[in-house]
Swiss-Prot record:
The keyword Glycoprotein does not apply. RAB2B effector protein required for accurate acrosome formation and normal male fertility. In complex with RAB2A/RAB2B, seems to suppress excessive vesicle trafficking during acrosome formation. This is Golgi-associated RAB2 interactor protein 1B. One of its GO terms (cellular component) is Golgi apparatus. Its main location: Golgi. One of its GO terms (biological process) is acrosome reaction. It comes from Rattus norvegicus.
Length: 344
């Protein structure tokens, strides 16, 4: 005979759990914003810079290779040129199988503007198609120069023939004609690059009253004995540019900028201290030059006016574009009616 046992009732009351759903405002990721602004290609679409042959080309692959490992996190904006010489008609110096790869990049990825120029000699095999990104047979490429853009003068020399004039600090002059396989859009990017390197972007500042930390070149340098006025007089006829040694390696360039920043701050401190001492002296005493001041080297050419911008900061405020091609395209529309000789 089966007996049914009634279930026991617990003496405590079971607590009811209520699930509370909290709603948080979701923000798109940085890559989503970059895609919305057109700075990154959408999934499934090819990068327009790769299609034009100005990004991820032979020069970029070479400097990012394990052999060089230069500026691994920076984008390289590059194109292929043919070196020509001046005459009645522009004539090619080398054979058609020899081209010059010219590109710009940044020593630090967060810089909105490039500050390094790359030059390489490319020798294509006989009968090889000169494709820029993924050639079937790797051509012979030789890296010729890595120069800071401060020591380079770049001009749009012949708009019709698509020729650039490149002059280095050693007075070496190159006339480079854009390869005929590149479309006209690529040359417009180079025109825009010359413009923004000369005038800057809207996000940059060249106001000397704004304190820019870790600036490589101080705004004003004075030499003992009052020679700064002589330097300014002698430099009026020179092209505006900036001069001081700049190391291309990222760690060394950051260390150099830190040294110049510390020297510049020390100079400001010592000059303010000397002014306080001069106030306490009698008016008959002459002010002595500061011992800690940085002397100017009068033999440096291409120094008319020191200009610096936000692209020379080690840590610019706010996120910056990661693509040089997108930086050129996102800036204001270029003025294509340029006269030969617009230089940076």
């Amino acid at each position: 005979m089966m007996t049914s046992v009634p279930p026991r009732k617990t003496w405590w009351k079971s607590k009811k759990t209520v699930k509370v759903r909290r709603s948080y405002s979701t923000f798109p990721s940085l890559n989503a914003w970059e895609k919305f602004r057109g700075l990154l290609p959408v999934d499934g679409e090819t990068n327009p810079g790769v299609g034009l042959g100005v990004e991820e080309g032979l020069l970029c692959q070479m400097v990012h290779s394990p052999e060089f490992n230069l500026f691994p996190n920076s984008v390289v904006f590059e194109s292929n040129f043919v070196q020509v010489r001046r005459s009645r008609d522009w004539k090619e110096i080398y054979k058609a199988s020899n081209t010059m790869a010219l590109g710009v990049t940044s020593s630090v990825p967060c810089l909105p503007l490039p500050n390094i120029l790359l030059m390489a000699r490319v020798i294509w095999h006989q009968g090889q198609s000169q494709t820029w990104n993924r050639p079937s047979t790797v051509p012979s490429i030789n890296l010729k120069s890595i120069l800071p853009l401060k020591f380079v003068e770049l001009q749009i020399w012949d708009h019709h023939e698509r020729i650039l004039r490149l002059r280095t600090v050693t007075e070496k002059i190159y006339f480079l004609k854009l390869h005929p396989d590149h479309p006209e859009t690529v040359f417009r990017f180079w025109i825009r690059l010359v413009q923004i390197l000369h005038k800057g972007l809207s996000i940059t500042t060249k106001d000397p009253t704004i304190l820019v930390t870790h600036c490589l070149v101080p705004k004003s340098l004075c030499s003992p004995g009052g020679k700064s006025e002589l330097v300014q007089k002698n430099s009026k006829g020179l092209q505006p540019s900036e001069s001081l040694t700049h190391l291309m390696a990222q760690g060394e360039s950051e260390a150099l900028s830190q040294i110049f920043s510390d020297l510049h701050q020390q100079k400001q401190y010592s000059s303010s201290r000397s002014e306080k001492v001069q106030i306490n002296k009698t008016s008959s005493e002459k002010a002595t030059p500061c011992e800690d001041s940085i002397p100017c080297t009068c033999d440096l050419n291409w120094r008319d006016a020191f200009m610096f911008g936000e692209w020379e900061r080690e840590n610019p405020s706010g996120p910056q574009p990661h693509s040089l091609l997108s930086t050129l395209a996102a800036s204001s529309r270029p003025r294509l009616s340029l006269i030969g000789g617009n230089s940076i």
